[in-house]
Amino acid sequence: MMRIKKVALAFALVLVVVPATAAPGLAEAESAPLYLALGDSWAHGQGAADPATSGYVPQLYRALREDLDCIPAVVEEAADGCKQLQLVSLGRPATAALPGVTAPAVRDEQLPMALSLLERNHDANPANDVEVITLHVGGNDVAGPIQAACIGGFGAECIGTFIAEMTALQADLAFVVGTLRAAAGPDTPIVLGTYDNPVPFCDLAGIPGAIQLGALILEGTPDGTLPGVHDIVRAVAAAYDAEVAEVFGRLDAAGDWVGGSDCLHPTDSGYDEVTEAFEEALAH
């Protein structure tokens, strides 16, 4: 049924090491409904004690198995849950061979496999559909260039870089989400993730203006003249009938973040909050 397209060998190796309970073999997944997760190191669960169990993707997967009505039930008692649901998780962390995932990286590495899996949504068997798609990407696209241009002050170079990076992100993210929507069909839930600001809880907090810049990159200016990552995510979601998991402001304790030299990743308690945001988005 599926014609799995080749992806980069290094990316394939990342997939192989995902535990079978989280990401089944493709032969097993062919006949079962799927939750398909794409994205960056947040989607992978980096920073969690065990990304395969306490990242937000596996947590959401367990919740969906309990709560998602994925197949019309013959009797009412069978209507609750989706016990057959399988997880295919394509998110990955940065590695020595592969930098952090951006929207173009999702396009090149993850989208080909996602499209192959989504072919099942148009076959004659409704029991093997991709039932839910989540995507978490955008932070790596813009944070580095904007931090480099703006940490010394909010001048012309900073503003120009900010606008250019956000414009590129919007185009790249729209391509990925639009392609997923076209392949999945109009009724498949797609949820895009947002982030929270880790800077108050890591080594960058001591740099004047760094905390404010971290928030600006994510949320943009209050008057909307400079859109942030989350403004882009919300606009793209609205354009393609997707939901948004609103994470910003939820991870408000030091224990929610790895901290120190890691100015990116949540801990288990942080991923608990992210999971709740995705659950709320899917409940809309």
Language-model regions: role of each:
Residues 2-27:
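Secretory targeting and sorting signals
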Residues 48-158, 162-164:
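Conserved SGNH/GDSL esterase-like catalytic core that processes O-acyl groups on lipids
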Residues 28-40:
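N-terminal segment immediately downstream of the Sec signal-peptide cleavage site
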Residues 38-41, 77-82, 90-94, 135-139, ...:
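Active-site-proximal beta-strand/loop segments in catalytic clefts of secreted hydrolases
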Residues 111, 173-177, 230:
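Generic structural signal for well-ordered alpha-helices
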